[in-house]
From Swiss-Prot:
The gene is dazl. This is Deleted in azoospermia-like. The DAZ domain is essential for the translation activation activity. PROSITE patterns: DAZ, RRM. It comes from the Eukaryota. Gene3D superfamilies: 3.30.70.330.
Length: 229
């Protein structure tokens, strides 16, 4: 960088993104920051902060007021189960340029609990459209986005909140379900009962064979033999 020359913001972000990619190439797993934040694979969302360790009783307005001292908050999204119970993490969207890394490096506590902060990572999905002869181009169906947890053990995935866009955010921390709540992980399989039917042999089989003189007549799937004299 030449001294006295100010680079555009887009170029600086590009250099920062390349630096992250270099770190990822050196590590077989996801990049882990100094505060324990595991940076998963994906695209970093600007001016968006991941907030983990949220108390179940905290609402979005309290989070908005708390982070307003770091910049103008545009929106706060707390991820919840279908029943409305908080999963313990969420996202803070700032309406202005904010240095997310400066916020992440600070030991921030909220209501006596230390928050787990990190940049929001957005994973791009291929928006393949499903076409059909019965469906026009304007009625194509896009795949449903889902939340992905990079710390869950293999074979175990928590229920995922659905966003209204074509992208998905990934959380770097794993959170257990609240007491008394059980979420089925494997869909139930229903076995189909098989019935065996025995059909009686026709009288003309075996030793009692009848020589057919004329053609056979088929009526409603039942073969009837008519012998014309």
């Amino acid at each position: 960088m030449v001294q006295g020359v100010q680079l555009p913001v887009c170029l600086i972000c590009g250099l920062y993104s390349q630096d992250i990619q270099k770190h990822r190439q050196g590590f077989p797993s996801s990049l882990k920051l100094s505060n324990g934040y595991i940076l998963p694979e994906g695209k970093m969302t600007p001016n968006t902060l991941f907030v983990g360790g949220i108390d179940m009783k905290v609402d979005e307005n309290e989070i908005r007021e708390f982070f307003a001292k770091y910049g103008s908050v545009k929106e706060v999204k707390i991820i919840t189960y279908r029943g409305g119970i908080c999963k313990g993490y969420g996202f803070v969207y700032f309406s202005e340029d904010v240095d997310i890394q400066t916020i992440v490096d600070q030991p921030i506590s909220f209501k006596g609990k230390k928050l787990k902060l990190g940049p929001a990572i957005m994973k791009e999905r291929s928006s393949r459209s499903v076409s059909s002869p019965m469906i026009g181009p304007s009625q194509w169906v896009n795949p449903t986005p889902y939340m992905y947890c990079s710390c869950c053990p293999p074979g175990l995935a928590p229920p995922s909140p659905v966003f209204s866009g074509g992208n998905q955010y990934m959380q770097p921390y794993s959170y257990s379900s609240p007491p008394g709540i059980m979420v089925p992980q494997v869909p139930m399989n229903y076995a189909q009962t098989t019935y065996a039917y025995q059909y009686p042999l026709p009288q003309w089989c075996g030793e009692q064979r009848t020589r057919l003189v004329n053609q056979n007549f088929v009526d409603c799937g039942v073969q009837t033999l008519l012998t014309l004299m």
